[in-house]
Amino acid sequence: MAVCIRLARGGKKKKPVYSVVVADKRMARDGRFLEKLGQYIPMKEGGTFAINQERYAHWISQGAKPSETVGKLVAKQQNAAEA
């Protein structure tokens, strides 16, 4: 089973809210997932991103691959925390 960490779209028309989820790569974008790790709201000023770092690290250690977008958001959050 190929597991990935990706964004699942929710919210209203023209006002997206994305959930950061762990899902089987074969499932639909907004379909079944294994665990919800956090949330990304791009419409707020600067974008609001929150993720459970402990669970994220757990899934990475288990072999889950983050999507390109999730990888960038996590790296941006870690850089902001260090500064």
UniProtKB/Swiss-Prot annotation:
Gene Ontology cellular-component terms listed: cytoplasm; small ribosomal subunit
SUPFAM superfamilies in the cross-refs: Ribosomal protein S16
Domain of life: Bacteria
UniProt GO BP: translation
A Pfam family hit: Ribosomal_S16
Molecular functions (GO terms): structural constituent of ribosome
Bilayer-spanning residue ranges: none
Keywords noted in UniProt: Ribonucleoprotein, Ribosomal protein
InterPro entries: Ribosomal_bS16 (IPR000307), Ribosomal_bS16_CS (IPR020592), Ribosomal_bS16_dom_sf (IPR023803)
Family according to the record: Belongs to the bacterial ribosomal protein bS16 family.
Name the record gives this protein: Small ribosomal subunit protein bS16
